[in-house]
């Protein structure tokens, strides 16, 4: 693959965050007397940011009078526990190191909270990920699938779209890449399966991180 810049999604692409997300969702629901969800439920809920995650998890979503309190409990718990079980997918650290050694530029764009995005990238990828951008709407950067985070990452890397590719695991990532005018590589080890991704327009797939080096 002859790309010089790689823009990665985080959850389900570089990191398996599902266990910690589900634990924090269920802690918040349990704390506020609401029914909990299975990990497969939470897998379906993720992808559009943590507020949307909790809208899907809380009965009646934002219409529930206890929604904001439950959402606040989730945020507090997740920021304290985002490293409990989260780990890079097999092959990710070595692949990032190999790309970096080739002179490639590497960034992360996520709908995750900015603080958690930075913490996870600093913890797991301190020497490879140059730019990490999380939820930033308060500063006028719309969340994915808007292209704003991708454009912000390219600006911070001081590179253009030429030679850049977006790598993600979801329909949101496919839409984000299209909106940013970038090719998209869909990974098959994440939170969505091949059939789902094909239904949402995926064209290029990889089954292992090392395929990015081919």
Language-model features: where?
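Substrate-recognition element of Asp-dependent hydrolases with the DxDx(T/V) motif
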Residues: 25, 92-122
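Helix-loop "lid/cap" segments that line or gate small-molecule binding pockets
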Residues: 28-29, 49-63, 153-154
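Short acidic-hydrophobic, aromatic-tinged amphipathic segments that line or gate anion-handling sites
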Residues: 204-208
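Metal-dependent phosphoesterase signature
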Residues: 55-94
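Active-site neighborhood of HAD-like aspartate-dependent phosphohydrolases
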Residues: 1-44, 55-58
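Substrate-recognition "cap/lid" segment bordering the active-site pocket of phosphatases
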Residues: 85, 113-165, 171-175, 179-180, ...
């Amino acid at each position: 693959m002859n790309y010089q810049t790689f823009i990665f999604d985080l959850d389900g692409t570089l990191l398996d965050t599902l266990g910690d997300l589900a634990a924090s969702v269920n802690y918040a629901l349990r704390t506020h007397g609401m029914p909990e969800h299975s990990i497969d439920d939470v897998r379906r809920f993720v992808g559009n940011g943590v507020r949307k995650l909790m809208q899907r998890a809380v009965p009646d979503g934002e219409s529930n009078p206890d929604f904001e309190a439950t959402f606040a409990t989730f945020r507090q718990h997740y920021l304290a526990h985002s490293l409990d079980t989260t780990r890079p997918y097999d092959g990710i650290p070595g692949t990032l190191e190999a790309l970096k050694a080739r002179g490639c530029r590497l960034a992360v764009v996520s709908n995750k909270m900015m603080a958690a995005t930075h913490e996870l990238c600093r913890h797991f990828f301190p020497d490879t990920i140059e730019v990490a951008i999380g939820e930033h709407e308060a500063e006028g950067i719309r969340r994915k699938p808007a292209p704003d985070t991708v454009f912000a990452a390219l600006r911070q890397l001081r590179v253009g779209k030429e030679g850049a590719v977006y790598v993600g695991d979801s329909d949101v990532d496919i839409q984000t890449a299209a909106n940013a005018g970038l090719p998209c590589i869909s990974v098959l080890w994440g939170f969505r399966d091949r059939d789902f991704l094909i239904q949402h327009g995926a064209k290029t797939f990889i089954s292992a991180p090392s395929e990015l080096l081919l």
